[in-house]
């Protein structure tokens, strides 16, 4: 299904229903000589074409020959060549500047150059293809827009909402992996006012089809996603997706990935439930440090790189949309202008001057050629608008979404860093408190030993010590310090960190000065703090292991992601350059043909 062919674009053709050259669109004109092309123009065009091929060779290098893929997909040795799908190996065409893949076809100059899905960094359309999109009836008898996926000889139809639920499930199952984005949902008000219709919204469906195809192939390129059972079930027609969402591992996902193993969140250990939950909003990225400074530095640099990408791509996307609007307006003006020229060229039929008929015929023919040149400009501009959307606007929008997803993954690591920081700080405070209590206990022991020695030598000192002990015991009985409740294993004196509810039922005396505690309370608090330290040390080992897994997994994910960004950006620039050169070449050739005809007029 070609979005350009089946859209309402051809309704804008002012020559539809006539005998004009472009009555059926520019795609109806066969490759080769135009009906108004003379021999002189052929020679001139060959010279122009040779010069142009030399220029393209300097820009893009030599194109390698096509090669077949063992998986039956689209492959290419470089950006310059593209193969044919299985069963059509005889229809392989060199992918030069004038050839672009459209829906599994190789089209030549003068035909629609609108690919169904822009190639990846290797010039391939990927292992997964969405071969059809339209209305279908699901297993529950509901009618919806379905997208048929072809993969490894099997086909399965999924709805957009199922793609969305797949991505959400993958984001929760793989919090350390950058999950490729999908096209955004339409506003809810749009569905009330104008529900999506397979006949009237072909362009929207085709755009989603292209972007969802990119989503599937990007997921397939990532090993962690490709080998995950949920992704494999999504591509398997034997599974009903609504049932997959109600069965493990999706159904047993934790509500908070911070309280679960980062690489296997469906199997949390009891210690994970003891970890603190840092706040979602964070003000700075690099404040909490771990015991892996090289990873800290690397991910801080990645955060800066993603921010730069976002700042660069945002204005490019806005500019591409603006240019698309301008070219649409230009194409509309050219359509009107071409129609006027063609109508004016027919005036020779109403002019009856026998002695000047030859000059009038030549003049009408020249005017007609000018009109045809304007028509070529119009149709080429329409194709350029379509290519700007597919080859520039869509991939840049996808890259922006990708950058946002990368920053979300970095935010997850930041929260794990804060968990590490909270546990490390709490351990240090507990050890400091134990040391303080033990030092005070030792000082009291030394003081009591000195007083005991002096009391044996002086009865007056002994009576004074007994009186002070009685007063101190009376104050301790009135003091409510023993009734204080603690607020969690990781509670500090400032008390700003939320902790799990299971750790909020034990008494704490950490807010009381050590000199106000009795010997029994000090001993009890030391025993409690030592018990807490055992759990904290286990949590510390756990968070260290989690951070190591997070760092290694995210490093692999970002290695792929940064390469993807660089390759996609290079591919976008090259495809956009090819599109502009095609547009300029078509327009220039049409005007050269018109000029040759004009030069033959006898003045």
UniProtKB/Swiss-Prot annotation:
SUPFAM superfamilies: PX domain
Ranges where the record places region Disordered: 1-36
InterPro entries attached to this UniProt entry: AH/BAR_dom_sf (IPR027267), PX_dom (IPR001683), PX_dom_sf (IPR036871), PX_Snx41/Atg20 (IPR044106), Sorting_Nexin_Autophagy (IPR051079)
Transmembrane portions of the chain: none
Location of the protein in the cell: Endosome membrane; Endomembrane system
Binding locations of a 1,2-diacyl-sn-glycero-3-phospho-(1D-myo-inositol-3-phosphate): 159, 161, 185, 208
GO biological process, one term: autophagy of mitochondrion
One Pfam family this sequence matches: PX
UniProt main location, coarse: membrane
Residue stretches making up the PX domain: 121-241
Keywords per UniProt: Autophagy, Endosome, Lipid-binding, Membrane, Protein transport, Transport
One cellular component (GO) term of this entry: cytosol
Membrane association type: Peripheral membrane protein
Any one GO molecular function term: phosphatidylinositol-3-phosphate binding
Source organism superkingdom: Eukaryota
Domain remark from Swiss-Prot or TrEMBL: The PX domain binds phosphatidylinositol 3-phosphate which is necessary for peripheral membrane localization to the perivacuolar punctate structures.
UniProt function note: May be required for cytoplasm to vacuole transport (Cvt) and pexophagy.
PANTHER family: SORTING NEXIN-41
Family recorded in the similarity comment: Belongs to the sorting nexin family.
Name used for this protein in its record: Sorting nexin-41
Protein species of origin: Eremothecium gossypii (strain ATCC 10895 / CBS 109.51 / FGSC 9923 / NRRL Y-1056)
């Amino acid at each position: 299904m070609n979005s350009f062919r089946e859209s309402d674009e051809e309704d804008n053709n002012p020559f539809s229903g006539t005998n004009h050259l472009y009555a059926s669109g520019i795609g109806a004109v066969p490759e080769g000589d135009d009906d108004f092309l003379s021999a002189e123009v052929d020679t001139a065009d060959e010279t122009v074409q040779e010069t142009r091929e030399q220029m393209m060779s300097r820009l893009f290098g030599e194109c390698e020959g096509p090669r077949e893929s063992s998986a039956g997909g689209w492959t290419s040795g470089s950006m310059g060549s593209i193969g044919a799908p299985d069963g059509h190996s005889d229809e392989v065409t060199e992918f030069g500047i004038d050839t672009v893949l459209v829906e599994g076809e190789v089209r030549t100059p003068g035909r629609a150059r609108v690919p169904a899905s822009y190639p990846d960094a290797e010039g391939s359309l990927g292992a997964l293809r969405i071969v059809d999109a339209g209305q279908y009836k699901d297993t529950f008898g509901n009618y919806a827009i379905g997208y048929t996926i072809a993969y490894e000889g099997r086909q399965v139809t999924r709805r957009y909402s199922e793609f969305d639920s797949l991505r959400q499930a993958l984001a929760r199952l793989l919090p350390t992996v950058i999950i490729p984005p999908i096209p955004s949902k339409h506003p809810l008000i749009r569905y009330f006012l104008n529900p999506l219709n397979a006949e009237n919204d072909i362009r929207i469906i085709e755009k989603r089809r292209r972007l969802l195809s990119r989503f599937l192939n990007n997921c397939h390129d990532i090993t962690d996603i490709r080998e995950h059972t949920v992704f494999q079930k999504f591509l398997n027609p034997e599974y009903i997706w609504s049932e997959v969402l109600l069965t493990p591992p999706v159904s047993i996902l934790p509500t908070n990935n911070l309280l679960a193993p980062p690489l296997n969140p469906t199997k949390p250990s009891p210690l994970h439930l003891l970890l603190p939950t840092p706040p979602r909003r964070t003000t700075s990225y690099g404040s909490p440090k771990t015991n892996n400074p090289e990873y800290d530095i690397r991910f801080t640099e990645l955060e800066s790189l993603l921010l730069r990408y976002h700042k660069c791509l945002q204005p490019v996307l806005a500019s591409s949309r603006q240019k698309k609007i301008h070219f649409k307006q230009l194409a509309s003006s050219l359509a009107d202008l071409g129609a006027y020229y063609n109508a004016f060229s027919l005036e020779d039929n109403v002019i009856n001057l026998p002695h000047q008929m030859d000059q009038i015929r030549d003049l009408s023919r020249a005017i007609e050629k000018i009109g045809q040149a304007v028509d070529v400009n119009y149709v080429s501009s329409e194709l350029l608008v379509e290519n700007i959307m597919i080859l520039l606007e869509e991939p840049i929008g996808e890259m922006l979404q990708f950058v946002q997803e990368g920053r979300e993954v970095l935010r997850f690591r930041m929260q794990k860093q804060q968990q590490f920081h909270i546990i490390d700080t709490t351990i240090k405070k507990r050890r400091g408190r134990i040391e303080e209590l033990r030092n005070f206990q030792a000082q009291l022991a030394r003081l009591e030993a000195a007083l005991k020695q002096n009391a044996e030598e002086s009865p007056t000192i002994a009576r004074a010590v007994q009186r002070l002990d009685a007063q101190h015991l009376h104050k301790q009985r009135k003091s409510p310090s023993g009734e204080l409740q603690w607020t969690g294993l990781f509670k500090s004196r400032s008390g700003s960190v939320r902790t799990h509810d299971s750790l909020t039922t034990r008494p704490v005396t950490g807010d009381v000065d050590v000199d106000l505690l009795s010997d029994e309370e000090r001993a009890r608090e030391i025993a409690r703090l030592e018990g807490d330290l055992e759990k904290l040390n286990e949590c510390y080992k756990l968070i260290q292991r989690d951070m190591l897994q997070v760092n290694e997994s995210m490093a692999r994910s970002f290695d792929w992601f940064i390469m993807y960004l660089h390759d996609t950006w290079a591919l976008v620039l090259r495809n956009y350059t090819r599109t502009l050169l095609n547009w300029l070449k078509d327009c220039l050739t049409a005007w050269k043909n018109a000029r040759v005809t004009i030069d033959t007029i006898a003045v």
